[in-house]
Swiss-Prot record:
Listed GO CC annotations: ribonucleoprotein complex; ribosome
Coiled-coil regions listed in the entry: none
Top-level taxon of origin: Archaea
Protein's name according to its UniProt entry: Large ribosomal subunit protein uL16
Gene: rpl10e
Family (UniProt): Belongs to the universal ribosomal protein uL16 family.
Keywords: Ribonucleoprotein, Ribosomal protein
Keyword match Ribonucleoprotein: yes
Amino acid sequence: MVNRPARIYREWKGPAYTRREYIKGVPDPKIQQFDMGNPAGDFDVEVSLVARERAQVTHNALEAARVAANRYLTKTVGRQNYHLKIRVYPHHVLRENPLATGAGADRVQEGMRLAFGKPIGTAARVREGQRVVTVRIDPENFEHAKEALRRAGMKFPFPFTIVVDKGEELVQD
């Protein structure tokens, strides 16, 4: 099935649909790794990407953000000099009512009859003010952390800000 634009899934509609034990055929989320770099490292600065409005983030967007931020940090500061953490998990199951197109579609298609939809993916529900991605890093690499979070934020369907959670006195903006 084709990946549809994120704007289709961005809005919260109704309660979260998460009970996988009752849902058949939920595809696994594309994002499997949530900690990158050096999780055991001792870093003085912690920077986070914060959502400015509530939204749903698809598992594809989370994976794209992870790859973008991790690749940038690995190339610029090295794998042992940071810890990148994705702080949300795609629990919410997305559904789609498949509509047939092309010749003879009217004979095959059900239309809005039995329109509940089949599971097509998962999404994380993000609240306003929630931290989505966090980078722990040394003060000399602070600008690289900000750029990595900016690149990750471009993959999300909501406006964001980058805030310093720890070590604000060590970095001068």
